[in-house]
Amino acid sequence: MEKLYNNIAYEPDASPSDAQNVPYLKHPPKIIDISVGRQLFVDDFLIDSTDLTPEYHKPKKFEGNPILFPETPWETDGAPATCPKSGGVWYDEEEKIYKMWYEGTWLKNMCYATSKDGIHWERPDLGIVKGTNLILPYENYTELEYHMPKVEYLRPDSTTVFIDYSAPKDEKYKLYLHNPGGCFPAVIAVSGDGIHFHDFALAGDMNTGDRSTMFYNPFRKKWVYSVRAFWSGRCRSYRESDEYLALAAQGSECERRWMACDDLDKANPYIGFPPQLYNVDCVGYESIMLGMFQIMYGPENNVCETGGVPKITELMPMYSRDGFHFSRPCRKSFLNASIHEGAWDRGYVQSVGGICIIHGDELWIYYSAFGGYEQSRSSVDTERDVLQRCNRTCQASPRRLCFDER
């Protein structure tokens, strides 16, 4: 049993996280340590009694969306895309600049962009491929060069980039990349500048689903794989390690079932597809782990390809005091798909690595969405990405932000 920073007694077990039965909410510690971070009333952990009803608000989408869209040849060579899926959008506290890692052209290129204000983005010439902002040109990565069997290229299907300020300078940036095409080990690496990566390794024997990601739990100092699994439709399994690169050595015995949709997640009445958990991204925020629960409302890929429309996924925030058990007290979509024909955010709304950035009294939440292309009926052209930002103003003092008002 592990005693956490807030006095929660955390004991890993084989049971998945149940959002309706969170152990520390049912049996909170008698004394709660509130010395770490600002305390947020996102659940009932800090409340002994009340006659108030929580109200959960939605963010206001930025009127200037989308803030990044396919323009360059390497973003339009195939199905056009500028999509951090999950990628990463961060404000680098040391360099005082916004940074973004995203997918340029659907399932093809890994790109890097910067911004002075988090809204207007530039594509710097990085010199890796002359005149471009490409950072991992997949044709340069061969089985011989990196000694990675069955991995002859690096193409982003699902990625995460995390900034680690506590690491040695040449390991400040952590990369997770899953190639498209099925269930097989992902690729991990580290970097000193977020551009030139090294120490590439396969993530052990982890035959993960294509939409797997990773994150860091700063309260327990654990690196976590958020693994796409299929034990309850699309769902999630969990692995953790003290050292990031050590995750590569883990076997499947280290994996635990983590979370899935439940009976409170209702189908979209116009689609009728049983909801499934598509992806999970998480980040440490103040005194909690903040997560984005991406629900898939359908339909399946073959139906979308036939109609030239994106599948419908939407985002729902979730909260944890131990990093494993998450509550979802509000089951309404936080960032929803527009769904209607012609909308550039018609569907496939997805969170980013890092989830949000503090900006004064606001949280700026970055996400990506797809418009579809009904004129096309091929699987290559069905999904056209745009990156968008929305921000949300909370009625609170700077940085004292929460997601419900009591």
List the model feature ranges, each with a label.
Residues 330-332, 352-355:
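Beta-strand/loop-rich accessory regions of lumenal/periplasmic or secreted enzymes
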Residues 352, 362-365:
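Long, C-terminal catalytic modules of enzymes
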